[in-house]
C-alpha cells in the first residue's frame, strides 16, 4: 500500500496492479486517493486504480466492511461510478442511496438507475420506482426503459413484482396507448389498398 505514494508513476502502477489481486477493504481508500491525485494524462494509472477499487468491491467478504466506512463526497462519487460494474445487491442499494442524495449528469443517472434496478433487493424496488418517477416525471420513454430493466431483474431473482411495480407498469402502458403518435410506424393504423398493402 505504501508503494501507491511512491514518486515513480511506474511503481505506483505496479502497486495498484497488485492490489487488484489481493483484495481487502483497507485497500479502497488508498486506491481512491491514487486515482484522485493521478495526472489526468496518465490514463493507465487512473484505470488501474479504478480496476483495483472494482476488484476489491467484488470480494463478498469485504463489501460489508467497505459499505460501513464513512467516505467523503469525492470518494462517494467515484465509488458510485465504479459500483456500476459490481453485480451485488449491497452495492446496488448503496448506489440508490447515492442517487437519492446527490445530483448527477442525466446519462450517469440513467445508467445508475439501470444498474440499481437490475440488482436491487426486492425490498428497495419501490423506493427506486418513486425516485425514477420523480427524476423522469416528463420522460416516459426513460421510465419505460427502466421499468423493463427492473422487471427483468425481478424475474431473474425469481421474485414477483410488487403492487407498486404493477401499478407503475399499468400507468406507463396506459400513457403510451393514450398518446400513440399518428407518425409512429409501430402503432399507426393505415388503410390498405386492394392488394392488402398499406397505402402511404
Question: Residues of each region from the PLM?
Answer:
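Long, ordered, helix-rich scaffold segments
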Residues: 1-200
Amino acid at each position: 500500500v505504501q508503494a501507491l505514494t511512491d514518486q515513480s508513476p511506474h511503481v505506483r502502477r505496479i502497486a495498484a496492479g497488485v492490489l487488484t489481486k489481493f483484495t481487502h477493504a483497507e485497500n479502497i481508500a488508498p486506491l481512491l486517493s491514487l486515482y484522485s491525485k493521478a495526472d489526468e494524462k496518465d490514463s493507465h494509472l487512473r484505470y488501474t486504480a479504478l480496476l483495483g477499487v472494482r476488484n476489491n468491491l467484488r470480494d463478498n467478504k469485504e463489501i460489508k466492511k467497505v459499505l460501513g466506512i464513512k467516505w467523503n463526497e469525492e470518494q462517494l462519487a467515484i465509488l458510485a461510478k465504479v459500483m456500476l460494474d459490481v453485480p451485488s445487491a449491497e452495492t446496488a442499494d448503496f448506489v440508490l442511496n447515492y442517487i437519492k442524495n446527490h445530483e448527477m449528469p442525466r446519462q450517469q443517472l440513467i445508467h445508475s438507475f439501470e444498474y440499481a434496478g437490475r440488482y436491487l433487493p426486492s425490498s428497495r424496488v419501490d423506493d427506486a420506482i418513486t425516485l425514477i418517477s420523480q427524476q423522469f416525471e416528463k420522460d416516459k420513454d426513460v421510465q419505460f426503459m427502466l421499468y423493463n430493466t427492473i422487471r427483468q431483474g425481478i424475474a431473474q431473482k425469481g421474485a414477483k413484482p410488487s403492487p407498486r411495480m404493477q401499478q407503475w407498469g399499468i400507468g406507463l402502458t396506459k400513457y403510451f396507448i393514450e398518446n400513440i403518435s399518428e407518425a409512429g410506424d409501430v402503432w399507426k393504423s393505415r388503410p390498405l389498398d386492394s392488394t392488402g398493402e398499406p397505402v402511404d
